[in-house]
């Protein structure tokens, strides 16, 4: 996907520090934007965020007010609903009641603190999407996403209104395993149309 986007623009890729509250992810993303602007003043800027990174991108776009576009890849519309859906009922209840959860994932042993959930409460993603308008937004999702239900993409597009371009791929999972090339080509075309006037 980054290679396809790179046909039209310079691409900066980074990973958020793991298991952080979303407010910290927003801080990291804003720091990256500041560095890009320092190095390339006047450059057109588009944010692409996947899953929770898409939510951080929504928040950042609303706060920034000077971006040129937003791409939401398998992005939630309601953060608490998303985690209530993917966690067991017991895990969610324990975390929501103030208990720290310990687990292992691809990064090794991790701890999920209660403020991971409570931090969500200050962010109304549909309202933030509306605040970011008239920013053009490409919304990409798979209909069989097992983590972020496709209806959340539809709600994101509805909140955006006419500035949204929604594409839901039939079947497919949260990682776009079957559709990464197709989605990447669509993304590249969308970017290309918006960068015809020139960019970094």
Which positions does each model-derived feature cover?
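Short alpha-helix in the alpha/beta-hydrolase fold that links the catalytic acid
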Residues: 125, 149-158
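Catalytic histidine-centered segment of alpha/beta-hydrolase-like enzymes
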Residues: 172-184
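Short amphipathic alpha-helix adjacent to the substrate-entry channel of hydrolases
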Residues: 1-12
């Amino acid at each position: 996907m980054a290679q396809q986007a790179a046909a039209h623009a310079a691409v900066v890729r980074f990973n958020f520090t793991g298991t952080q509250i979303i407010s910290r992810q927003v801080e990291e993303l804003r720091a990256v934007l500041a560095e890009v602007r320092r190095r390339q003043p006047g450059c057109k800027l588009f944010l692409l965020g996947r899953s929770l990174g898409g939510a951080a991108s929504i928040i950042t776009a609303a706060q920034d007010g000077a971006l040129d576009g937003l791409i939401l890849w398998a992005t939630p519309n309601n953060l608490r609903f998303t985690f209530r859906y993917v966690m067991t009922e017991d895990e969610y209840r324990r975390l929501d009641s103030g208990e720290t959860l310990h687990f292992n994932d691809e990064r090794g042993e991790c701890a999920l603190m209660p403020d991971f959930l409570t931090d969500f409460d200050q962010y109304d993603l549909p309202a933030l999407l509306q605040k970011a308008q008239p920013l053009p937004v490409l919304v990409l999702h798979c209909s069989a996403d097992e983590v972020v239900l496709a209806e959340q993409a539809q709600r994101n597009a509805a909140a955006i209104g006419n500035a949204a371009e929604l594409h839901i791929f039939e079947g497919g999972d949260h990682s776009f395993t079957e559709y990464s090339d197709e989605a990447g080509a669509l993304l590249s075309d969308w970017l290309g149309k918006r960068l015809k006037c020139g960019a970094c």
